[in-house]
Amino acid sequence: VEEWKIAKTWVLVHDMGSPWAVEYFPWAYSEPEKGRYDFQHADLVVEYAYAEGITILARVDFVPQWARPKDTTTRYLDKDRFSDFGDFIYAFVSHFRDRLRYFIIWNEPNITAEWGYRPVSPEDYTELLQIAYTRAKEANPQAIVLVAGLAPTLEGEQSEWGMSDLLFLQRMYAAGAQPYFDALAIHAYGGQLSPDDPADPDRLNFARAELLREIMVRHGDAAKPTFITEGGWNDHPRWTKAVRPAQRNAYTLRAYEKALDEWPWCQAVCLWAFRYPRPAHSYSDYFTFVNADFSLKPIYLEVQRYAHGR
């Protein structure tokens, strides 16, 4: 990505009124060979965000070719390579010790597409989390380590596609995850439902975040915060899971209000997605706040008015 695009993106994030942002730092980009680190691009991203006063939640995954078997996806990491990921976390957290504090370990490990198209395993992810947490704290004891945002899904334990986010988190606790994270990342998509649609284990909606929070409380983690690191609504004119643009605007602002007024345990709401580097030419383009050419969408202007009016 050209430097001017990085700079412009962070200016727009700041001007919209957002103090937080989730940024993706692919492991493969910064460690193309074992032990050879290249943080040049990551440095640009962090420096421009820092200049605009934005606090970054750094998501780290994307396995380099040298750390996985041939013909596997960038989400495939064997257990005997978990220590390589831990080494990278140590190097990454050390490098950004004075500039980054929040680190999200992996992404949606409860669905097979994000776990290398293998059966998902809360126990294996807990082992990976333990290694990453330990190495992050070695690099910076003040680092805040977040459990990966889990994909909201109703899949059962034996599904070929994944596992319910609620069940996955419960099994993580059973596997001993509690000492190895400081906060929980949550993915809170609304579908076609209002943010005030009540939480229900058999329903996917924005308020499902409350059910994940209840699991934390039951396991003695009431003092740990959560961060919504993905979520929101889509306003594609023909996608079956989309809402109208006016609904998207209203639901988004109500989601911010709900988190502020009703969820003291939620420290930030970061919705998907600010901007894509290029058009996807599909429904996913209608999750963004800013077009690839940097033109502003109505949702951006609505959030900007809301943020500056509080």
Residue locations for each model-derived region?
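A short, local hydrophobic-aromatic micro-motif
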Residues: R101, D182, T229, Q267-W272
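Substrate-binding cleft and catalytic face of glycoside hydrolase catalytic domains
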Residues: M16-Y37, H41-S159, G191, A222, ...
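Noncatalytic carbohydrate-binding groove/subsite architecture in carbohydrate-active enzymes
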Residues: F82, G86, V120-Q247, P279-Y300
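Boundary/entry segment of secreted carbohydrate-active catalytic domains
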Residues: V1-Y24
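A structural motif corresponding to the C-terminal end of an alpha-helix
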Residues: Y48-T55, H95-L100, I131-A143, A175-Y180, ...
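A general structural detector for well-ordered alpha-helical segments in enzyme core domains, enriched
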Residues: K8-V13, D38-Y48, F85-H95, D124-A132, ...
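Aromatic-rich peripheral "rim/lid" segments of glycoside hydrolase catalytic domains that contact
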Residues: E33, Q65-A67, R81, H95, ...
